[in-house]
From Swiss-Prot:
Subcellular location per the Swiss-Prot or TrEMBL entry: Cytoplasm
GO annotation (BP), single: protein folding
Keyword Chaperone: yes
GO molecular function: adenyl-nucleotide exchange factor activity; protein homodimerization activity; protein-folding chaperone binding; unfolded protein binding
Lineage, top ranks: Bacteria, Pseudomonadati, Chlorobiota, Chlorobiia, Chlorobiales
Protein name: Protein GrpE
Entry's family note: Belongs to the GrpE family.
Keywords: Chaperone, Cytoplasm, Stress response
GO cellular component, one term: cytoplasm
InterPro entries tied to this protein: GrpE (IPR000740), GrpE_coiled_coil (IPR013805), GrpE_head (IPR009012)
Amino acid sequence: MMKKAEDPLQDREGTIQEHTEGQAGTAAADQSAAVETPESRIAGLEREVQAEKEQNGKFRDELLRRAAEFENFRKQKEREAVMASQRATDNVLRDLLTLVDDVERVLANVPEPEEIPAAAKPYIDGVELLKKNLDRWLESKGVKPIEAIGMKLDVDFHEAISQIEHPDAEPETIVEQYQTGYLLGDRVLRHAKVIVAR
């Protein structure tokens, strides 16, 4: 008996068909596994939202911290600039006070009016005018002299350079002023140098 010759083409078609059916079955299984339920999709999205909120919170905290650091830095630089300006102003005013002291010494040594020669009178008037203008300018800048004579010694405002016997004054009372002290606003620009009674 002769066997019927197998058709190679039919074998191939059968194999292809079996393979295709197998792939279709696997794809269907994968597809059914890949299809999410609405609940699982919502749960996944909620997890993502929560993770984003946490990340957003971290970024927000970092931003607030950096903003606070910058604000503190800015305020510190402003304070430093104000202090530097204040120191520069104080130094200029202190230097100017030595000029005021010199003018006061000149005026303190002016002879009595009847002893002043006529030729010297305009110069003395000029020095007096200079003193008035200096005092007016200092006052416009907030600089004022510290009261001293007749006051009790206050080390915050006065510097005692000597003590003397003075029958008409109580102890620690200022009886003479050697150098005028000045305030700039409420700060001591220069202490008054004074002589106090024992």
